[in-house]
């Protein structure tokens, strides 16, 4: 959050003191500095953790930072569409891991969820192109969940 606070302060100062192209350039510079800092931190953080944790534990930390959305989403898709192939499951997992990496860098919970939302849309498009009727799959899934006493 410090990275975002620095960016916000610079943007606020630029908007209060500059005009025109100078203001736009200062705002863009603040965004670029934020992106560069996030890029560094994104790789420094797991590297520092690796001194004390193994890969599985680092993934658990990443999942904690992103509210466990990766596995909830993956398990939901696998439960919703029991006929998914191993290839389809692997593609879904790959996209969700990518989403988690972006979500880790997001500045708040809404933006973390938005990162996953983008990839959920990508997954839905992928599955639809592969011939799955997602509306029908969701309806059948809801029936199965209800039959076993659960809720969605």
Please name every model-derived segment.
Residues 1-152:
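Charge-rich (acidic/polar
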């Amino acid at each position: 959050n410090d990275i975002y606070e620095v960016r916000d302060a610079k943007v606020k100062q630029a908007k209060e003191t500059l005009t025109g192209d100078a203001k736009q350039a200062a705002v863009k510079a603040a965004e670029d500095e934020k992106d560069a800092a996030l890029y560094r931190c994104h790789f420094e953080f797991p590297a520092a953790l690796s001194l004390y944790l193994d890969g599985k534990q680092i993934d658990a930390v990443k999942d904690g930072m992103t509210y466990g959305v990766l596995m909830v989403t993956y398990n939901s898709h696998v439960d919703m569409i029991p006929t998914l192939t191993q290839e389809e499951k692997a593609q879904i997992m790959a996209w969700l891991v990518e989403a988690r990496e972006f979500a880790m860098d997001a500045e708040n919970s809404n933006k973390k969820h938005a990162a996953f939302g983008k990839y959920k849309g990508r997954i839905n498009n992928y599955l639809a192109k592969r011939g799955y009727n997602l509306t029908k799959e969701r309806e059948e899934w809801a029936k199965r969940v209800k039959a076993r006493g659960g809720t969605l």
